[in-house]
Amino acid sequence: TMADSKEKLFSDFSPVSTEQWMEKVTADLKGADFEKKLVWKTNEGFKVKPFYRMEDLEGLKTTDALPGEFPYLRGTKKDNNEWLVRQEIKVECPKEANAKALDILNKGVDSLSFHVKAKELNAEYIETLLKDICAECVELNFSTCQGHVVELAELLVAYFQKKDYDLTKLQGSINYDYFNKILAKGKEKGDMVATAKALLEATASLPKYRVLNVNALTLNNAGSYIFQELGYALAWGNEYMNQLVDAGLPAAMVAKKIKFNFGISSNYFLEIAKFRAARMLWANIVASYSPECLRDCENKGKDNECRCAAKMKIHAETSSFNLTLFDAHVNLLRTQTEAMSAALAGVDSMTVTPFDKTYDAPNEFSER
């Protein structure tokens, strides 16, 4: 039957050379300039041709990359390309925030982000906020005033221990981002190394909690080009590695505590390329520190190098830079394509911002 037939139909067509393609394209342009009409000149400083041939791939080492294998160009997971759907909650009242969290969890969200007030932090506050939320079933992310991140970490660990959770299984993050504060405010505050050390010590029992943040979303929302966001983010992450390894902390431990928050612009194909390049470049940056593998792991590199430490943890959020005020429902289309590019690129979690974020407090419809 035809269904069982495995004929190679391409053999019925004679091969077409690049020169023949160009002749056909030039003829169809009817005298228009090929470079001006069809070649895309990106803001990143390189040109994208309208078609590519096998010869364009010659010499590229990345074409043999596989998912889940160093340097993780095609993702850090071998078997799937799943991502977590995250929603942000600004906590004004812990009881109300808890009710909202439970509601959106029932609607399919599997990652929560709480922005909590530092002045109100105590054990009762955490218990009220997380009541009936299974910390082993959902990723929990927290941010607060940078001077109170260690206190927040200690309260969370105490709460998880009180609830008798297996802390080695819990996934989440605490947003300590020393360099973002400098970027936003133009001045240093506190001792990064001392705070980071205290934070790593406080979360030692939470190996899957990332607590050193690279918030490149700030750059994206300020209108940076993709290459700028990528370059600064990698330098930012490397600065954590450099200072903390110099302070005596193991490279593998530091790398496994860093999380990257990127924005997603509407530049569809280059956003896919950005996330893929970010993973590959970060893997090589971490590898340059020769992180030592401290357990029996099949993902070891040469000389007992910890390849797991080189996996970049990425959260992505649709950009607010290009949201429009005057026809806000257009933002639904923009955020949809932005989210799709991040999903195809293999991010770990994603926030799609409400379409009316620029002018109104989000309601149930816009959050959905």
Where would I find each of the regions flagged by the language model?
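Catalytic alpha/beta active-site cores
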Residues: 3-267, 271, 292, 297-300, ...
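Helix-loop-helix hairpins and the membrane-proximal interhelical loops
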Residues: 278-279, 296
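Flexible glycine/proline-rich, aromatic-decorated loop/lid segments
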Residues: 305-317, 326-353, 363-368
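Short glycine/threonine-rich loop-to-helix capping motif typified by GTGT followed
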Residues: 224-230, 265-277, 319-332, 360-368
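ATP-dependent phospho-/nucleotidyl transfer catalytic cores
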Residues: 280-285
